[in-house]
From Swiss-Prot:
The keyword Protease applies. This is Ubiquitin-like-specific protease ESD4. SUPFAM superfamilies: Cysteine proteinases. Its EC number is 3.4.22.68. It is a peripheral membrane protein. Expressed in seedlings, leaves, shoots, flowers and roots. Residues 51-60 have a biased composition (Polar residues). InterPro entries: Papain-like_cys_pep_sf (IPR038765), Peptidase_C48_C (IPR003653). It comes from Arabidopsis thaliana (Mouse-ear cress). PANTHER family: SENTRIN/SUMO-SPECIFIC PROTEASE, UBIQUITIN-LIKE-SPECIFIC PROTEASE ESD4-RELATED. The active site is at 380, 397, 448.
Length: 489
């Protein structure tokens, strides 16, 4: 219910409160909080001294006081004091915002006026429209002296401009047409605080650049002379050196003698399925029978087996015996030697001590130039070589693998073998151990056994390993032919 006086009439304070609300200039502010309105009844506030009107609504509205226009004053934003150490911080956010927009306005106006220096009257024109009407520029010559701008706040500002570098503006008045002479000059003139003396294109700066370049020219000439002199000295040194003639590697003919038609026909008949159970060759010294099924390992894409490898190594030893001057003195261990020497229980010299007796071989191992040891590693064949002539231990893998344990075991074996058979002490552990890298390598997964046999064949001839993967099909046919005839060529 509204507040009512004792005599059932409204007090004058209620009307004063309404009048204050309508005239409060901060009413439209977002931070303004209006107090709660007083509620009262118009029916109880009628004056008894005045006659009642026929239209009660009009009579009630006429009793309200006329709204008074608020005083024209600058609008201030609300401020909030930030208490710090008991003191309120001065609020200058409104002032900063006002200064920010003023600066933006001044910068835009200055840029626009600077661009007008390069505007002339002409046939080709750009209509500036209503924006030109707000400016009044008076100029009697090619330079702009002053500009008077009237803004919405009734403030007048006068800006002095620098004289232009060309007759860009002759007479600019309200409503006239303009033509832009050079847009590049207009863009360059947007910087009002340029210093012409510091411009790199000025004559003084150009002279300084020329002087510094002349100083460098003398140094560059001296360096150029030294370069030419050193090039001549280098050419004289190259001419004085003896020319090195590259030695042409001669590929021997014997390891690559092609098979005749009869020899190829003989090999293909042995590979036929009719001879799988037939014994095609028997090596008496090693007591190994070569059947058609065993010989099938020399067909393309097949893995070599122990019988073929061991028979071929026996044939290489017999070839050396026939022509000892043509081939190196070598010993060829079979594929079971290393498995006996190094088993699952470890190194065991006693397991192979009887393999190399003087009575069985007719010579001592320390008298051989090379000793070949085939190594079978489950699904891959590799080769270890004991080179007595050069006191080296070599390991050859067609897949470029390494295994130091194999060479260490063979070094220990050579020491035990020399002490057991000859009574000599040999420290093979001090020999060079080399894992040969520059050697022919296989390009598939089934020619490792063939590569191993050819390593042995070429080393026993005293030749380098001058073959490749392309020769493997030929070597398979040739090895089959030599096994069938029990003679290695």
């Amino acid at each position: 219910m509204g507040a009512v006086a004792i005599n059932r009439k409204r007090s004058d304070e209620s009307f004063n409160f309404i009048n204050q609300q309508s005239t409060n200039p901060l009413r439209n502010s977002p931070y303004f909080q209006a107090s709660k309105k007083r509620r009262f009844s118009f029916a109880m506030s009628e004056d008894s001294g005045k006659p009642a009107s026929s239209n009660p609504t009009i009579s009630r509205i006429s009793r309200y006081p006329d709204a008074k226009a608020p005083l024209r004053r600058e609008i201030h934003a609300p401020s909030r004091g930030i208490l710090r150490y008991g003191k309120a911080k001065s609020n200058d956010y409104c002032e900063k915002d006002a200064n920010f927009f003023v600066r933006k306005y001044d910068d835009a106006k200055r840029s626009a006026l600077e661009a007008l220096r390069f505007v002339n009257k002409g046939k080709d024109f750009v209509d500036l429209g209503d924006e030109v009407e707000k400016e009044e520029v008076v100029s009697d010559d090619s330079s702009v002296q002053a500009i008077e701008v009237i803004d919405c706040d009734d403030d007048e500002e006068k800006k002095n401009l620098q004289p232009s570098f060309s007759s860009g503006v002759t007479d600019v008045k309200k409503g006239e047409n303009f033509r832009v002479e050079d847009t590049s000059m207009m863009l360059d003139s947007l910087s009002l605080d340029r210093d012409v003396d510091n411009d790199a294109s000025s004559l003084e700066a150009y002279r300084k650049l020329m002087q510094s370049a002349e100083k460098r020219n003398s140094k560059l000439e001296a360096l150029g002379f030294e370069i030419v002199l050193n090039e001549k000295k280098l050419s004289l040194l190259r001419q004085s050196r003896p020319k090195t003639v590259e030695k042409r590697v001669e590929v021997p003919r014997e390891p690559f003698i092609p098979l005749t038609e009869d020899e190829e026909a003989e090999v293909y008949r042995a590979f036929s399925g009719r001879n799988r159970r037939k014994v095609l060759a028997t090596h008496e010294n090693s007591n190994i029978d070569i059947t058609g099924e065993v010989l099938q390992c020399l067909t393309p894409s097949a893995w070599l087996n122990d019988e073929v490898i061991n028979v071929y190594l026996e044939l290489l030893k017999e070839r050396e015996t026939r022509e000892p001057k043509k081939y190196l003195k070598c010993h060829y261990f079979n594929t079971f030697f290393y498995k006996k020497l190094v088993s699952d229980s470890g190194y065991n010299f006693k397991a192979v001590r009887r393999w190399t007796t003087q009575r069985k071989l007719g010579y001592a191992l320390i008298d051989c130039d090379m000793i070949f040891v085939p190594i079978h590693r489950g699904v891959h064949w590799t080769l270890a070589v004991i080179n007595n002539r050069e006191s080296k231990l070599l390991y050859l893998d067609s897949l470029n693998g390494v295994d130091p344990m194999i060479l260490n075991a063979l070094a220990k074996y050579m020491g035990d073998e020399a002490n057991e058979k000859s009574g000599k002490k040999i420290d093979a552990n001090s020999w060079d151990m080399e894992f040969v890298e520059d050697l022919p390598q296989q390009k598939n997964g089934y020619d490792c056994g063939m590569f191993m046999l050819k390593y042995i064949d070429f080393f026993s001839r005293g030749l380098g390993l001058c073959f490749s993967q392309e020769h493997m099909p030929y070597f398979r046919l040739r090895t089959a032919k030599e096994i069938l005839r029990l003679r290695a060529d």
